[in-house]
Design a protein with these regions (language model features):
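Gly/Ser-rich helix-loop-strand patches that form or flank binding pockets
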Residues: 15, 19, 26, 111-161, ...
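Hydrophobic/aromatic beta-strand patches that form the interior of the parallel beta-sheet core
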Residues: 34-36, 104, 125, 152, ...
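Electropositive phosphate-/nucleotide-binding environments in soluble metabolic enzymes
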Residues: 69, 73-76, 108, 179, ...
Length: 284
């Protein structure tokens, strides 16, 4: 069951959309959303390799701190507005049976903030990377490779998702990553109205999809199995079949090859990250 959701944010304009996803989950599971804003250190904003006088340095540090204060204040007010819109209670701590959210301010590198808070979160929500603007890739990587926790990648939407984790699809290939993804999202699967296992049936040296179906049925999950013909575009096939069955969320293991290898040469995970129009819960 999802009780604590981490949402790392920065002033890139993507926080509203990701909060809408996290809020939908918080309302569904009566969870607690921790919105963690990473404030850059003023020293890190100084020109690199350029000698500047002490008075100018002091002025720049002061101006940087003022800008950071304004950004923080604006984002905090935005959170309060969004919380009211989604009917979520502002609370520093989780309240049993109530959807709540809290704002925390950290200073330093975002990857360190994600490490520190993500390792004790049931789910980490991040924006779908924007390749054109070079935004979000490092956040997704930090959450996936440095926390050991499930990460929901949230696609850009004009409004809050009407359904989330209601009809869940599982991309299954029998791998360790896929097995871990199922194990770490059992609470989601058990609460879903419907679960569809998507598989090519080619689980080499791994648990087959029929066995996964039986495993989930033993836990009371309403699950069905859809096998499809294998192609060289597994990621594309997964997304097409998600649309075919009407799944609102996809769960899959992430980057069985290295992230760099999949990014350069292509791979199922990278295709899904680049092209998915539905939320995807990734587990590495």
């Amino acid at each position: 069951m999802i009780r604590k959701i981490l949402l790392p944010v920065r002033g890139d304009g993507k926080g509203d959309n990701v909060f809408a996803h996290a809020a939908t989950l918080a309302v569904r599971y009566k969870g607690h959303v921790v919105v963690a804003h990473c404030r850059p250190r003023a020293e890190d904003l100084m020109p690199y390799g350029i000698a500047i006088s002490a008075p100018l340095r002091k002025l720049l540090l002061s101006q940087s701190a003022n800008v950071a204060d304004q950004v923080e204040d604006g984002m905090r007010k935005e959170l309060e507005s969004l919380a009211a819109r989604f009917g979520i209670t502002l609370s520093d701590k989780a309240i049993p049976g109530v959807a709540t959210t809290a704002w925390i301010e950290e200073q330093g590198r975002q990857v360190d903030v994600i490490k520190r808070h993500g390792r004790l979160a049931d789910l980490i929500c991040v924006a779908k990377p924007d390749v054109d603007r070079n935004l979000g890739t490092n956040t997704l990587k930090a959450a996936l490779f440095n926390t050991g926790r499930p990460v929901m990648m949230c696609p850009p939407l004009d409004s809050a998702p009407e359904r989330l984790c209601d009809h869940v699809a599982i991309g299954w290939n029998g791998s360790v990553e896929a097995s871990r993804a199922v194990a770490m999202t059992l609470g989601v699967l058990e609460e879903a109205s419907e679960v569809t296992v998507l598989s090519t049936g080619a689980e080499v040296n791994g648990a087959d999809s029929e066995s996964l179906k039986e495993y989930l049925q033993a836990r009371g999950v309403n699950v069905k199995l859809l096998r499809f013909k294998s192609s060289r575009k597994i990621g594309r096939d997964l997304l097409q079949h998600c649309a075919q069955v009407g799944a609102d969320t996809l769960i899959m293991g992430a980057y069985s090859n290295s992230h760099e290898t999949e990014t350069v040469f292509g791979g199922a995970t990278q295709y899904v990250v680049d092209h998915s129009g539905i939320p995807v819960i990734l587990v590495h």
